[in-house]
Regions:
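Extracellular/periplasmic carbohydrate-active domains that bind, remodel
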Residues: 1-439
Length: 439
């Protein structure tokens, strides 16, 4: 169906815009090249199916990019995708149909003809994605790099790796989306060096979304299966909302609200490549069956950035009205900078965390390694010596009305702090009893 799809786009372009309509049925193809002022509409019952490459045909080759050393292959190329656009404006993809990346892959993505993303957009503006579904999307369901004025509304994603990667984008609205991504992050904001220059991801709202780590395909078909216990990084399922890891640029003015996490990792805010992460507000979050730290804030020094880039900053963060049930206690919540680079001005309030518990007083004597240059995940620290929050290399942290519950007794202290100043605890309870912060 590739030739017919190309003709449809050419006709729309010749008329200075219009709608390319996919009626009910399957349309197997390789790369679809978007154009400005085009509305791609996928009707109910229509499926755009990514074909498997053959010896003579395949997806568009990855374009040259001299700035690949600071991020992986997937973040550095856009054309090797099922649907892609570069330097475009006024684009809409909508409709109740399905984009099925059947022939896409995360593996062997450097080979000629191989496609590794469902939708890729670079340096575009005024883009709307709404109402369709994405299944089995290779490395990314959506990679949007340097896209300004991006709206993603009521999109369902069920894939094996990342769902939405929002990289170096400005003015982004993500709402009423369902993203299942057991082997990678569901909704992730990034600020890579893929464009060849520093650019922040800023002015982003994520609201009324559901993210999870159920088995691939089992959310779209509503079977909610749990038979794939481990992601490729050996960290169990993923499926979370995250800022980072790519963070050469920064993250500014981000609001996340009214979201549900289920059978996945917890909320992660990470800047480890020199970016500034600041002015973040997160509220009304509920989590269930969380496999690592419910709240993970990390300022590190991996430094996948041009030489001379200084360590980043993390400050002015508000997290409130969070409920977490059945969280793995090995990795309690973590707020950790590094020596000489402190996380600052964080307030956590109106939080309930229900942990599994079961660890010992001896576990409370452990000292986690610094791991300044390591890829940030909670398990890089080993078992956490605190059963509530581990707080290190910070300044001006407030915990107010934070309530902890434990299914099994846990002998570790509730809070462990190191190189921490101006820490305030207010209205803290453990299993319904007031916690004396003087102890």
């Amino acid at each position: 169906d590739c030739a017919a799809i190309i003709r449809a786009f050419e006709d729309a372009v010749s008329q200075c815009g219009g709608t390319v309509f996919f009626p009910a049925g399957d349309f197997a193809c390789y790369s679809i090249r978007l154009a400005s002022h085009i509305h791609l509409y996928i009707e109910q019952g229509a499926r755009i199916v990514g074909a498997f490459p053959s010896a003579t045909e395949g997806y568009d080759p990855a374009e040259p990019n001299e700035h690949t050393r600071f991020q992986d292959f997937g973040h550095s190329h856009w054309k090797n995708s099922l649907i892609w656009g570069i330097g475009l404006e006024d684009i809409t993809i909508s409709g109740p149909g399905l984009i099925y990346g059947k022939g896409l892959t995360r593996e062997e993505s450097r080979l000629p003809g191989v496609g590794n993303k469902a939708i890729s957009l670079k340096l575009c503006k005024n883009v709307t994605l709404k109402d369709f579904s994405l299944l089995q999307c290779g490395h990314f369901g959506l990679l949007a790099t340097g896209v300004d004025n991006l709206s993603i509304l009521n999109v369902k994603v069920d894939t094996n790796r990342d769902g939405f990667d929002i990289d170096c984008c400005k003015n982004v609205r993500i709402s009423h989306c369902t993203v299942n991504a057991p082997w990678d992050d569901a909704i992730v904001l990034k600020a890579s060096y893929g464009l060849g220059y520093f650019k922040d991801t800023e002015n982003v709202t994520i609201s009324d979304c559901f993210v999870s780590g159920y088995d691939r395909g089992s959310v779209l078909d509503c079977t909610w299966q749990r038979d794939e216990p481990q992601a490729p990084d050996h960290g169990f399922v993923t499926g979370r909302i995250k800022l980072g890891t790519e963070s050469s640029g920064g993250f500014k003015n981000i609001a996340i609200t009214n979201c549900i996490f289920e059978r996945c990792r917890g909320l992660a805010l990470e800047t480890v490549d020199g970016g500034k992460l600041e002015d973040i507000v997160i509220s009304n979050i509920t989590m269930r069956d969380i496999v690592n730290a419910p709240i993970f804030l990390r300022l590190g020094a991996r430094m996948r950035s041009p030489q001379g880039t200084p360590v980043g900053t993390m400050k002015r963060i508000l997290i409130s009205h969070v409920n977490v049930f059945n969280a793995d206690s090995r990795y309690s919540s973590i707020i950790s900078g590094i020596p000489g680079a402190l996380i600052e001005d964080v307030t956590l309030s109106d939080i309930h965390i229900y942990h599994q518990g079961g660890y010992t007083e001896a576990d409370g004597l452990l000292t986690p390694p610094e791991q300044e240059k390591v890829y940030p995940e909670p398990w890089m620290f080993g078992t956490i010596p605190a059963k509530g929050f581990y707080i290190r290399h910070v300044r001006n942290i407030t915990l107010d009305n934070v309530n902890f519950h434990y299914e099994k007794a846990d002998g570790r202290p509730l809070f462990v702090t190191d190189d921490a100043s101006d820490i305030r605890y207010r209205n803290i309870t453990v299993d319904g009893k007031e916690f004396n912060t003087a102890n």
